[in-house]
Amino acid sequence: MNHELRSVIDAINPVDQSLMAAAQAHLDNLTKPRGSLGRLEELAARLYCIAGGRRPLRVDPARVFTVAGDHGVSAEGVSPFPQEVTRQMVLNFANGGAGINVLCRTAGVDLRVVDAGCLGGPFPEHPALIQRKVAEGTASIARGPAMSLETCEKALLLGISLAEEAAADGCRCVGTGDMGISNTTPSTALYCAYLGLDPADITGPGAGLAGEAVRHKVEVIRRALEVNRHIVEAGDPVATLAALGGIEIATLAGLVIGAARHGLACVIDGFISTAAFTAAWKICPDVRGYCFLSHASAEPGYRSVVDALNAQPLLHLGLRLGEGTGGALAMFLMRAAADIFNDMATFADAGVSEADD
């Protein structure tokens, strides 16, 4: 493993779960029946642990990174959209016209768009666009590794640097978002490799496939797993990410690792972002305590994924857009959880009698 990457991972402190009891005691002393705010209480308690017991809890400033990259596997016919849509959507993000732009504005969340691996040369200069291209797309995972180990490590380090910059700007929460035509295919392959799932069980329509086209996508993923089997079986999670992933997926995995390094809560978006989280978790298990799955993706295989991860997403809205949209919505819930912890009165403060034990 790259020395710089190893040094970041070695510097990550696991979340102190021993603080959970103190957090719950405080929540139980607020003017409400115990547990009556449900998962908001769980969120607040986890944020308290991430903060090391420091109060008040803070989620803001919050920032979503929508990271873009192209995929060689697009040539295998696994998406109904042409590959140039990746580049077109990056321009749409920069100009404020996409779903993630609207939801970040609604939620009061900062948005940064990142070209990590799009085909073509530089984009026109734009204040909303970070241009740090690691490479121009990947090779087809159905024919060999998506990228070299060196390229994958560069993408991971890019993601780590994005988290570092967010922390330097005072952010307390970051979110993952993606853009890359065909990226449900490498994401599915990563789930199969990391979690032992079967492509036939978790491959879905992505951006709109149906019937025979989905079955073809399953076969492409099977070929990818077979041609890269020697890499996967060697058990190195970074090498597996290089073989089966994408540049934006690796960058998002680095963002997760970097968030943990800087003690930031990290909100994970949908199907693709959860693949990036899974890679980060395999590379460094301690990142898990900092991460929150924002929503249950409508991709049919996502339930099997979260079951394998033993995780519980926050929202169930039938979303399957990506871009970070679910993360932006979940950040509002996290802000609400922090405010409850910080601002609700205790029974003693309010002069309210507690329930009998």
Curated annotation (Swiss-Prot):
Pfam name, any one: DBI_PRT
Reactions catalysed, as given in the entry: 5,6-dimethylbenzimidazole + nicotinate beta-D-ribonucleotide = alpha-ribazole 5'-phosphate + nicotinate + H(+)
Highest taxon listed in the record's lineage: Bacteria
ATP-binding is among the record's keywords: no
Keywords in alphabetical order: Cobalamin biosynthesis, Glycosyltransferase, Transferase
GO terms under biological process: cobalamin biosynthetic process
Pathway: Nucleoside biosynthesis; alpha-ribazole biosynthesis; alpha-ribazole from 5,6-dimethylbenzimidazole: step 1/2
Alphabetized GO MF terms: nicotinate-nucleotide-dimethylbenzimidazole phosphoribosyltransferase activity
Family matches, as Gene3D superfamilies: 1.10.1610.10, 3.40.50.10210
Record InterPro entries: Nict_dMeBzImd_PRibTrfase, Nict_dMeBzImd_PRibTrfase_bact, Nict_dMeBzImd_PRibTrfase_N, Nict_dMeBzImd_PRibTrfase_sf
Keyword Cytoplasm: no
Enzyme Commission code(s) on record: 2.4.2.21
Enzyme class, broadest EC rank: transferase
Residues annotated as catalytic: 323 (proton acceptor)
Entry similarity comment: Belongs to the CobT family.
NCBIfam families: cobT_DBIPRT (TIGR03160), PRK00105.1 (NF000996)
HAMAP family cross-referenced by the UniProt entry: CobT
Function: Catalyzes the synthesis of alpha-ribazole-5'-phosphate from nicotinate mononucleotide (NAMN) and 5,6-dimethylbenzimidazole (DMB).
UniProt-recorded name of the protein: Nicotinate-nucleotide--dimethylbenzimidazole phosphoribosyltransferase
Provenance organism: Nitratidesulfovibrio vulgaris (strain ATCC 29579 / DSM 644 / CCUG 34227 / NCIMB 8303 / VKM B-1760 / Hildenborough) (Desulfovibrio vulgaris)
Gene designation per UniProt: cobT
